[in-house]
Amino acid sequence: MGTVLSLSPSYRKATLFEDGAATVGHYTAVQNSKNAKDKNLKRHSIISVLPWKRIVAVSAKKKNSKKVQPNSSYQNNITHLNNENLKKSLSCANLSTFAQPPPAQPPAPPASQLSGSQTGGSSSVKKAPHPAVTSAGTPKRVIVQASTSELLRCLGEFLCRRCYRLKHLSPTDPVLWLRSVDRSLLLQGWQDQGFITPANVVFLYMLCRDVISSEVGSDHELQAVLLTCLYLSYSYMGNEISYPLKPFLVESCKEAFWDRCLSVINLMSSKMLQINADPHYFTQVFSDLKNESGQEDKKRLLLGLDR
């Protein structure tokens, strides 16, 4: 009888199972190692991404700060310029409150010239009168006011003093002559408004002061010369192109009238231009005319004291 070798199938199955188990375990270990590597890679990628985001955020903040800084500096510059402009405008508005420096004095001549001129008997150095200057360094402003009737009264008093030979002349007589001519031209339609105004009376006074002589011997002669000056005042200061001669004529001969006109023009042409071009000269003549009334009061006071 032969020997029978029996092989248990469970052993084989166990071996296969063990092998299978070993194989699956090995596969599981390999998969676990791969998963561990993937996890490590994911961790590294996450770790590397977080600092990058922070860097990007920080750099963005820096860029924003750099962009904001020029705007803030620009606003600061604008504010500074506005303050400077405000200060300049305030300083310009307050210029009148500041005192201007006095004008520079001309250099004095050498001592040798002064001594030489003094030894010759008279000094050649003369001090020019200085105009009145205020604290601000500008010439003093003079304001003179007077009505037409007041200036006409002053003109009549001046003519009475100038023509001392005319004993019966009243200060109102020249005023009546002037107003009669002005009214006649208004009624005839040669002018729309009266010519007798303060400025025109000042112009007439300037002419009469240099033209009318103290040697006038009659009222008729004074009236002829006064109306000649009035005609030139109308021609120079009036609004119309021309005026009729009849209201200004006293004598029948027109040649005598035109001769007087030419003599007055030759004598007073420069002053007639100056009184319109120079306001200071006009103010001076205005003041002189207004002071004529004060001179009459002084004269009456002296006559009363003499009596």
From Swiss-Prot:
Modified residues (Phosphoserine): 8
Domain of life according to the entry: Eukaryota
Free-text tissue specificity from the UniProt record: Brain and neuron specific.
Record-marked site positions (Cleavage): 98-99
Segments for region (Disordered): 97-136
One GO CC term on file: membrane
Quaternary organization: Heterodimer composed of a catalytic subunit CDK5 and a regulatory subunit CDK5R1 (p25) and macromolecular complex composed of at least CDK5, CDK5R1 (p35) and CDK5RAP1 or CDK5RAP2 or CDK5RAP3. Only the heterodimer shows kinase activity. Interacts with EPHA4 and NGEF; may mediate the activation of NGEF by EPHA4. Interacts with RASGRF2. The complex p35/CDK5 interacts with CLOCK.
Name of the molecule in the record: Cyclin-dependent kinase 5 activator 1
Gene: CDK5R1
